[in-house]
Amino acid sequence: MPLSVSVFGTGSFYVLRASGDSMINADIDNGDLIVIKEQKTANIGDIVVAMTDDGKNTLKRLEYDKEAQSYYLHPENPAYEDIYIKEFRVQGVASHVIKAL
């Protein structure tokens, strides 16, 4: 899918389809298209695509636990628990959500 620089800005982007309901409180629903800016770093609070230590990608909010002194991935649905893992790699940061009408 070609993405307009005037809408999305410069950089390398890709689109993925959200699967599941773990991000519903961030207004990301099952089946939504998510525009991801490809980058290896992110800020706390960003919604990121992260590859976990088991090789799977997940879309979650990046947070930091001051007591544990570690980053974790936070689902935006209270039915799911935070993901504390030893290692994960940021694959990109969500920039836009595209919803079907």
What annotation goes with each model-predicted range?
Residues 1-101:
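Acidic/glycine-rich C-terminal interaction modules and beta/coil loop segments
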